A protein has these predicted regions:
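N-terminal export signals
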Residues: 2-3, 9-30
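Boundary regions of SH3-family modules and the immediately adjacent low-complexity/disordered segments
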Residues: 31-38, 93-134, 185-227
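Short, structured beta-strand/loop micro-motifs enriched in basic residues and often containing a Trp
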Residues: 49-58, 140-152
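SH3/SH3-like (including bacterial SH3b) beta-barrel domains
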Residues: 57-69, 149-162
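SH3/SH3-like beta-barrel superfamily modules
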Residues: 67-109, 159-208
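Cell wall/extracellular polymer interaction/catalysis modules
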Residues: 173-277
């Protein structure tokens, strides 16, 4: 099987000869697929949406500038609100940047770590899993858009991007002008008949943005511990959202999370998004999955959600979230959102066990997974 496409084949597939710039709104002075020149710093932050930069870590402090979607800033230090705490919000964290302070929930913690691309698929394999290790990478669609997510972006003249920490399945490699590109295939990397909820979109991106996953990325944590002694406890209390992993009575991991929302966008109490209380069992794990649901206006459609550990047949899962940084505060439609590094640890620790060859793993029997308890404190 030929793994490297010719330049002619690549241009034909990606639509360059058909005026690809007409539907990808990138700056004309650079290639649509070229990685941007991100700030130089060990720690960076990606802006989720329009935000103000303040002179002090407080919403009452003057604004010195405004930043917009996907701008990247140097992340110098995380601090808490200066002066009296703002009792209207739960999260009091701010990030100090060279230009001032930004409210931490509005910045994704990212790094810029380009990689040396491979030029061929591993021998005997149909593809490989890879993680985005730069703040974002612009993607070019092959063929017609299938998912609502991509259709909406293109209709609004917005770029199609993957973001830091997303994990995707790469099934083709191409070279163009001395630059190597990978193709992300939403349907790849899973056993036959399992699509991971995807619509089957095919997207090309600059290869240096992606790090190949290794067996160590999915290696089990504490494999010698009796699986029946492992337990996950999720606290969905509205102002105290946490997750703990136990081996017997010993807590071995702790992190902040975001469970299902208690209120709608107008502040009205709602119940349809709450993470279900009670005892559950992990039954499926997926290295990367396409998540969608809800209705028009309140629905969601998100590709490449990494490190998903499903604990309910209704689709509730513990998984990474790259679209917000407001952990400790309810934010989801019922799932348990984690920082990517937290979701990955839980994924490796809980059962069933995965391998790179087995992107999706399903527990044998309904009770053979890891015990999950969702509770709510009453004060």
């Amino acid at each position: 099987m030929k793994n490297i496409l010719s330049r002619r084949d690549f241009l034909k597939l990606s639509g360059v000869g058909l005026g690809v710039l007409a539907f990808n709104p990138f700056k004309p002075e650079r290639s649509p697929l070229a990685l941007p020149q991100f700030p130089v710093s060990e720690r960076l932050g990606r802006v989720f949406s329009k935000i103000d930069v303040h002179t002090e870590p407080s919403f009452n402090a003057p604004s010195v500038k405004v930043l917009y979607d996907d701008e990247v800033v140097v992340w110098q230090q995380e601090v808490i609100t200066r002066g009296a705490l703002d009792m209207n919000i739960i999260n009091q964290r701010w990030v100090r940047t060279p230009d001032g302070y930004i409210y931490a929930p509005q910045l994704q913690p990212v790094k810029n770590v380009p990689n040396t691309p491979v030029t061929a698929l591993p021998s005997g394999q149909l593809g490989f899993w890879a993680e985005v290790t730069v703040p974002y990478v612009d993607m070019r669609l092959e063929g017609a858009a299938a998912s609502p997510h991509i259709k909406t972006l293109l209709e609004g003249n917005f770029p199609v991007r993957l973001y830091y920490s997303q994990v995707v399945w790469i099934d083709q490699i191409a070279q163009d002008g001395g630059v190597i590109f990978y193709r992300f295939n939403e349907n790849g990397g899973r056993p036959a008949g399992i699509t991971g909820g995807s619509y089957g979109d095919l997207l090309w991106g600059e290869a240096s943005a992606f790090r190949l996953l290794t067996p160590e990325d999915v290696a089990p944590i504490s494999p010698d511990v009796d699986p029946t002694s492992k337990k996950v406890v999720v606290d969905r209390t509205e102002n105290y959202q946490t997750l703990s992993c136990y081996e017997g009575s010993e807590e071995v991991y702790f992190c902040r999370v975001s469970t299902g929302q208690y209120r709608d966008s107008y502040g009205n109490p709602v119940t349809e998004y709450l993470t279900p209380l009670g005892e559950h069992t992990t039954w499926r794990k997926s290295i990367s999955i396409h998540m969608s649901g809800g209705t028009t206006g309140t629905g969601y459609d998100t590709p490449a959600v990494s490190w998903s550990t499903l604990f309910s047949g209704d689709g509730y899962a513990i998984h990474a979230a790259f679209w917000h940084n407001n952990f400790g505060v309810p934010r989801s439609h019922g799932c348990v959102n984690c920082l990517p590094e937290d979701a990955k640890w839980i994924f490796r620790w809980a059962t069933p066990q995965n391998t790179l060859e087995q992107g999706d793993a399903v527990a044998e029997g309904l009770t053979n997974g890891t015990h999950v308890i969702v509770q709510e404190l009453t004060i």
